[in-house]
Amino acid sequence: MSASVVLQPGQVTLAQWRALYRGAEVTLDPACAQAVLRSAQTVEAIVARGEPVYGVNTGFGKLASVRIERDDLQTLQRNIVLSHAAGVGDPTPVPVVRLMMALKLTSLAQGASGIQPDTLALLEAMLRQGITPVVPCQGSVGASGDLAPLSHLAAVMIGVGEAFVGDQRLPAADALARAQLQPRVLGAKEGLALLNGTQFSTACALAGLFEIETVLQAALVTGALSVEAAKGSDTPFDARIHALRGQPGQIATAAALRALMAESAIRESHRLGDVRVQDPYCLRCQPQVMGAALDVMRQAARTLEIEANGVSDNPLVFSDTGEALSGGNFHAEPVAFAADMLALAVCEIGSISERRTAMLVDPALSGLPAFLTPRPGLNSGFMIPQVTAAALVSENKQCAYPASVDSIPTSANQEDHVSMAAHGARRLLAMADNAAHVIGIELLAAVQGCDFHAPLRSSAALEAARALLRAQVPTLQDDRYFHPDMLAASALVRSGALATAVGIVLPGVELSA
């Protein structure tokens, strides 16, 4: 675990969410306690007045017109958790669930949900002590909130379901008891407050954003290495070209490519007398493609940062006036749109990378030995790794179909338009993983291509990247079992080690990055 992140409700930065996803501990700013208490007292006053308020003393969804007696309000809240814990599929990764828990924590702590202070304290304690609910990954349509996934979170808080504690999967009651925590008996509105909201979709989208950001930065490094391997030109990265268009992502990625290739002996060796006029688009248009991806990612990041700091419960409690107002903040359309944009971005990052690998293995395009092997024919070299990259890119293209354009009415047509944000966001981790493999294959191919130019060396930044790979994967002479090489390369991409090794601050999703 890294240093603790202090969550200030409504003011959590993207960098803090990233740190939390990467393993930072969580502390809730105690300054929120008064707002939480006032909100809970407002709900208690509403119950005492007996006025009908959705989810407080009524049924849910299509059953909203059914009034619930005061003596049954605790049972109502327990029942909604139990009945809505209807997810299926593999468990959501622990880092994503922890992110979801923190998102729910900061949402509830804003004092608009009517949660009891002790319930909020239990959620914070579970995060702090590493009790992570087992949350099946399928079952949310992204409106009315992420009901099924969040119900599996809430179930653990009442002692039902399962939780991960370290590497153990335990019954919820045992997990709480091990940490000397007591399950809660939920009061009026508390069950609904816990399971209504966009926190699952937002957590998945943020996790995808952070992984795709790492992939993009690695792809800038491998893209520069591919230019070197093919003895391509750095002229297309000239700042004057990109300033005339004005697209900020394009300007930033072109600057990164210039910095990565600065003072390369390989580039200088063919600056004069090269008969080629223009490189293929996969080399020449990297700033245009990668810059567009970066701009889209930054737009998605802004949407997700706002969502992560908002309140997506329903109804919302306004303590100043003593009201509980029904609305639709649970509808995750902003998250769905952001997830769709991220899917397009990671798809294109991988697509142009695969084209560079295909270019490198083709001697007619790269001027390098066929399939990057010294003895083609006897050896197949990088023939099939390029095929694997093509397969993964094709898979990502199929996954990139927008989820937000789909909608299936639910709850007897009461919830007649839904966002499908959960599905749209959940696919991002798999797409990022596919792209990491594609970039890893390009890393292997580009470094192999640069090896053919010895004793010429690349820039200091790219030589550091080459050394990082070569510390684990030797130059390919004759064919060998390729699988471990590919896993090693993709791990360097996924971990961020490749982007860090070059010693250059590469553009990221924060506008200041």
From Swiss-Prot:
GO cellular component terms listed in the entry, alphabetical order: cytoplasm
Superkingdom to which the source organism belongs: Bacteria
EC number annotated for this UniProt entry: 4.3.1.3
Catalytic activity reported: L-histidine = trans-urocanate + NH4(+)
Sites of 2,3-didehydroalanine (Ser) modification: S144
Record key words, sorted: Cytoplasm, Histidine metabolism, Lyase
GO MF: histidine ammonia-lyase activity
Post-translational modification: Contains an active site 4-methylidene-imidazol-5-one (MIO), which is formed autocatalytically by cyclization and dehydration of residues Ala-Ser-Gly.
Top-level EC class: lyase
Compartments in which it is found: Cytoplasm
PANTHER family assigned: HISTIDINE AMMONIA-LYASE (PTHR10362)
Protein name from the UniProt record: Histidine ammonia-lyase
Species in which this protein is naturally found: Xanthomonas campestris pv. campestris (strain ATCC 33913 / DSM 3586 / NCPPB 528 / LMG 568 / P 25)
Taxonomic path: Bacteria, Pseudomonadati, Pseudomonadota, Gammaproteobacteria, Lysobacterales
